[in-house]
Amino acid sequence: MNGEIKMLDKELNLFVINTNGEKKYIPNFGHVNAGFPSPAEDFVDDKISLDERYLTHPESTFLIVVGGDSMYPVYQKNDILVIRTDLIPLHHDDIIVSVNNEDYTLKRFDKINNKLIAINPNYKDCVQIHENDEVVILGVVGVLVREKTNRI
C-alpha cells in the first residue's frame, strides 16, 4: 500500500449508533465552578440533547470500550469512546488503528513523524509507520465518556 493510510470502508458498521430520529433531552444547569456550591435549580439555562451535541453524524459514528492502559491517564479501562469514521486524522489526534493486519488499538497519531504513540510513560515504544506498512484507521476519537462512580 506504499505507506498510504486508508480509512475503514463505510460498509463495516461496528457498534453503530442508531437514534431512530428520537432525541433525549436533559436539563442544562449551566456551568459549574469547583468552588462553593449554589442551588443549581436557580440557574436552569435550557435543556441539552446529548444526541445533538455528540452524535451529530450517527451514520459514521460508533462506540468502543477502552481496554488496557497504554493510553493512561487520558484514557482508562472501561472508558467509552465515541469514534467518528468520517474524520481525517490530524496531527496528535487519537485514533483506532491497525498496522499490517494486527489487532486494532487506540494510539495518538504523530502525523509529522509518521508514528503511533502510547501516551502512558510506562510504554516507551512508538510504532513507526513505514512506507510499505498497511495502515487501516477505523476512526478518530471524538468524545470520551467516563463513569465517575460505579453506581450508574
Residue ranges and their predicted role:
Residues 1-73, 77, 143-152:
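Short, positionally conserved secondary-structure boundary motifs
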Residues 69-72, 92-115:
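Short, compositionally biased
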